[in-house]
């Protein structure tokens, strides 16, 4: 991937906008369908490429069904055989503490409640075992997300992992990830996870700075984190990956560079770098508004953090797995995250879990009692299901390519029988090239550092640009869900674990 230079000196800070405010700004602009609303700022593409980020994750929207209608629709979908790659997501909706920046906190940790949940989760995994959608083809990656999956006791971990092995047709090389936090991730839990088949650990470190961690209500300090990570790596039995987040209040470039250096000094297999999203209703937004914390980093400063991480890991000879994911050993394959942005199916289990079958996105009930009550009636506890729009598969393929740092519209057009796809997009792509977001290399449109930083916005804008021109397109203006309606995007992000900023 191409590297543009980025500013080194301190730049003036502006109050960071919330995610929702940015999404509204982009939605209003794109709804006009004016070409300029899609164009990038050529004067400073890295720091000020667009007015705001379009969404947490790019993706075409759909028409939703709710409650019983969603459950009936999902029931019918489960008799269709799957094709292509498949994921499985398992949600564990309990946390010992609530981090200030998290919008996806569901339930406080109580040992008896977590143990009871594990047993109900096994019931749900077993419920549709043998149905075509669950068992007709291999599952290539399983992800335990949350919440805090490491809240499970060793016995609970063994129980649920045993059900996964028994009732899901795992591929021979299936990636099985357990997400969690360092705090209370004891040796007996690690060993139970390894015994149960976990071959990848994804731990939410976020920052090694004890001061920044304490301000975000994180529990363990720098030394404790490093000690536990080295202990986990010492088992040498699974990939160990950590998340780092940039943009926290009081997180200077010096703090961020120390985070990067510390991560690279450990025996890790991978590092994921995510930017902080400040949600309007999060405790963090409230603390900032009340003056209890300084502002989080604005878009321009976060761009410098991002560019520095790319520069640093490139110089350390780490390999790029996607715009946000880095690996240093062959163990880190990043399968779930890579396929999660694509059109592939994702089976989903657990309270608040989200998935996708045949292009239909769905989410389980987020209320624990509602989830339990519906499950006890012998039904899959779906709360929400969105049918795919026309051309959803093509659009998600664009989204997936953009996540990896480059898109080949000529190839995508051939695959989906839309020979003019690249020509449709060319006026927009040309402006982005001129603005410094993209470079053309053969048939590939490759993102610069600026393009990588804004890749989610680029993907969403490109899909919005193309959608009305595609065969069979619905004659409607883009809506808030096209750009990423905050409410729906937050619900689905919580369900599919793709906003790692909530990992503990």
Label every model-predicted segment.
Residues 1-86, 135, 485-502:
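Flexible, acidic/Gly-rich N-terminal and inter-domain linker regions that tether
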Residues 38-53, 66, 71-79, 83-91, ...:
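Extended hydrophobic/aromatic-rich secondary-structure runs
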Residues 82-118:
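Canonical Radical SAM [4Fe-4S] cluster-binding loop centered on the CxxxCxxC motif
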Residues 85, 109-131, 137-418:
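C-terminal scaffold of the Radical SAM
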Residues 92, 180, 446-448:
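Hydrophobic residues in beta-strands and at strand termini
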């Amino acid at each position: 991937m191409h590297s543009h230079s980025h500013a080194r000196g301190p730049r003036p800070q502006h109050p960071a906008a919330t995610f929702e405010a940015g999404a509204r700004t982009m939605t209003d602009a794109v709804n006009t369908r004016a070409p300029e609303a899609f164009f990038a700022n050529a004067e400073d593409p890295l720091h000020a490429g667009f007015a705001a980020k379009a969404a947490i994750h790019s993706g075409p929207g759909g028409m939703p069904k709710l409650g019983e209608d969603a459950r009936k629709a999902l029931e019918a979908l489960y008799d269709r055989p799957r094709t292509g790659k498949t994921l499985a997501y398992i949600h564990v909706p309990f946390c010992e503490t609530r981090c200030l920046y998290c919008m996806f906190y569901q339930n406080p940790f109580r040992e008896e409640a977590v143990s009871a949940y594990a047993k109900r989760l096994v019931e749900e995994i077993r419920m549709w075992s043998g149905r075509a959608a669950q068992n007709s083809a291999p599952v290539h990656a399983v992800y335990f997300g949350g919440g805090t999956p490491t809240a499970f006791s060793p016995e609970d971990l063994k129980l649920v992992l045993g059900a996964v092995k028994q009732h899901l047709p795992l591929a021979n090389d299936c990636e099985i990830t357990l997400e969690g936090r360092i705090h209370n991730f004891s040796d007996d839990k690690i060993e139970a996870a390894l015994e149960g088949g976990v071959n990848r650990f994804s731990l939410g470190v976020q920052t090694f700075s004890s001061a920044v961690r304490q301000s975000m209500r994180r529990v363990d300090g720098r030394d404790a984190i490093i000690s536990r990570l080295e202990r986990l790596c010492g088992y040498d039995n699974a990939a160990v990956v950590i998340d780092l987040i940039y943009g926290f209040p009081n997180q200077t470039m010096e703090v961020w560079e120390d985070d990067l250096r510390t991560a690279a000094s450990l025996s890790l297999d991978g590092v994921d770098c995510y930017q902080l999203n400040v949600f309007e209703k999060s405790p963090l937004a409230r603390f900032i508004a009340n003056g209890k914390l300084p502002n989080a980093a604005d878009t321009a400063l976060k761009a410098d953090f991002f560019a520095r991480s790319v520069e640093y890991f490139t110089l350390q000879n780490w390999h790029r797995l996607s715009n946000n994911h880095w690996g240093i050993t062959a163990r880190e394959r990043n399968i779930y995250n890579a396929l999660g942005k694509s059109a592939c199916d994702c089976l989903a289990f657990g309270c608040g879990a989200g998935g996708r079958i045949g292009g239909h996105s769905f989410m389980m009930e987020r209320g624990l009692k509602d989830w339990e009550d519906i499950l006890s009636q012998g039904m899959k506890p779906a709360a929400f299901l969105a049918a795919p729009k026309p051309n959803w598969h093509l659009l998600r393929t664009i989204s997936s390519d953009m996540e990896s740092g480059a898109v080949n519209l000529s190839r995508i057009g051939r695959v989906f029988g839309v020979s003019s796809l690249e020509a449709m997009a060319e006026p927009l792509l040309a402006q982005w090239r001129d603005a410094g977001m993209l470079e053309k290399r053969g048939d590939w449109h490759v993102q610069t550092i600026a393009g990588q930083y804004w890749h989610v916005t680029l993907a969403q804008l490109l899909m919005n640009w193309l959608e009305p021109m595609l065969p069979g397109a619905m004659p409607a203006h883009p809506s808030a869900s096209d750009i990423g309606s905050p409410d729906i995007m937050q619900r689905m992000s919580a369900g599919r674990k793709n906003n790692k900023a909530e990992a503990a």
